[in-house]
């Protein structure tokens, strides 16, 4: 049996590290995962030569959930990614969602078992990400924005939704500097110092004012983590609706109307790195074969 799944990344509205409450929205950059059955063992590979630890943990946890031994039944996983790694665009959440969802579907069909429901998949993927130490909070906001698409506002500590809804499919520009930033190794203490300010930004998100929330959150975290907040301000100056640091960096995102795309690209061209053009994703994780 062979199946393929598409799993998009997400961008930050509110980074949950400071307060435990977060918000994020799906973007049109994704990871594609293809899996096929084999006689035994779990084998994983990707197109970027990165460690496959997270993939292996996701598959192992799904096998354990169903009581399946990889000595008697196996799967081979391969991924191709449009998502830059260690950039604040939820590549780990997208990857874990993809592997858990595809392995669950194959096992359920192969053994005539019930497939995991959406939240079971998400929670298993989060548990795997925590075990792999690629997340600090569990990233329920990132994981659910990736899985469902649209925008989510969440209580990450308790893995609960506050808001889950579709978002207008604006163009999204991503500025990628020539370096990454792993969220699992971020300075948590430094970020928590600013929790009162982040709570103010979260209040905006909770009331549905996502763009102001993104702007404020981005400025707070960029300055706290040593990124150049002028990147976001420059985008706002030339017409972005909202712009800010995504996750713990290193990427910045700008949400805009079509007519502002070229101006934002131009103003960001003075910074070393590259600009990726995508849009808001409202589809989420879906099987494509």
Curated annotation (Swiss-Prot):
User: GO terms for molecular function, please?
Assistant: ATP binding; shikimate kinase activity
Q: Which UniProt keywords apply?
A: Amino-acid biosynthesis, Aromatic amino acid biosynthesis, ATP-binding, Cytoplasm, Kinase, Nucleotide-binding, Transferase
Which biological processes are named by the entry's GO terms?
amino acid biosynthetic process; aromatic amino acid family biosynthetic process; chorismate biosynthetic process
InterPro entries for this protein: GHMP_kinase_C_dom (IPR013750), GHMP_kinase_C_sf (IPR036554), GHMP_kinase_N_dom (IPR006204), GHMP_knse_ATP-bd_CS (IPR006203), Ribosomal_Su5_D2-typ_SF (IPR020568), Ribsml_uS5_D2-typ_fold_subgr (IPR014721), SK_arc (IPR010189)
Q: Name one GO cellular component term.
A: cytoplasm
Listed under catalytic activity are: shikimate + ATP = 3-phosphoshikimate + ADP + H(+)
Pfam families given in the database record: GHMP_kinases_C, GHMP_kinases_N
Output the Gene3D superfamilies linked to this UniProt entry: 3.30.230.10
Q: In which pathway does it act?
A: Metabolic intermediate biosynthesis; chorismate biosynthesis; chorismate from D-erythrose 4-phosphate and phosphoenolpyruvate: step 5/7
Q: According to its UniProt record, where is this protein mainly located? A: cytoplasm
Which Enzyme Commission number(s) are listed?
2.7.1.71
Q: Which residues participate in ATP binding?
A: 84-94
Location relative to the cell: Cytoplasm
Entry's PANTHER family? HOMOSERINE/4-DIPHOSPHOCYTIDYL-2-C-METHYL-D-ERYTHRITOL KINASE, SHIKIMATE KINASE
Q: Which family does it belong to?
A: Belongs to the GHMP kinase family. Archaeal shikimate kinase subfamily.
Protein's recorded name: Shikimate kinase
| Organism field | Methanobrevibacter smithii (strain ATCC 35061 / DSM 861 / OCM 144 / PS)
């Amino acid at each position: 049996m062979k199946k393929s799944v598409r799993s998009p990344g997400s961008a930050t509205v509110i980074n949950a590290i400071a307060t435990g409450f977060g918000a994020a929205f799906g973007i049109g950059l994704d990871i594609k995962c293809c899996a096929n059955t084999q006689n035994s063992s779990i084998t994983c590979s990707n197109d970027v030569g990165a460690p496959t630890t997270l993939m292996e943990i996701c598959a192992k946890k799904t096998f354990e959930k169903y009581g399946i031994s990889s000595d008697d039944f196996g799967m081979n996983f391969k991924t191709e990614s449009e998502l830059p790694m260690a950039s604040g665009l939820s590549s780990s959440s997208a990857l874990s969602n993809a592997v858990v969802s595809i392995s669950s579907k194959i096992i359920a069909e192969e053994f005539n078992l019930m497939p995991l429901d959406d939240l079971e998949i998400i929670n298993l993927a989060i548990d795997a990400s925590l075990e792999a130490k690629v997340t600090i909070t569990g990233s329920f906001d990132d994981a659910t924005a990736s899985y469902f698409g649209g925008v989510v506002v969440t209580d990450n500590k308790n893995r609960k939704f506050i808001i889950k809804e579709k978002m207008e499919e604006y163009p999204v520009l991503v500025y990628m500097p020539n370096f990454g930033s792993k969220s699992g190794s971020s300075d948590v203490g430094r970020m928590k110092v600013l929790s009162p300010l982040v709570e103010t930004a979260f209040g905006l998100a909770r009331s549905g004012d996502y763009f102001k929330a993104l702007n404020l959150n981005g400025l707070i975290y960029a300055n706290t983590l040593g990124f150049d907040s002028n990147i976001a301000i420059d985008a706002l100056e030339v017409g972005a609706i909202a712009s800010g640091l995504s996750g713990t960096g290193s990427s910045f995102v700008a949400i805009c109307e079509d007519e502002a795309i070229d101006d934002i690209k131009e103003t960001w061209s003075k910074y070393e790195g590259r600009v990726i053009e995508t849009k808001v994703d409202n589809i989420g994780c879906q099987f494509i074969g």
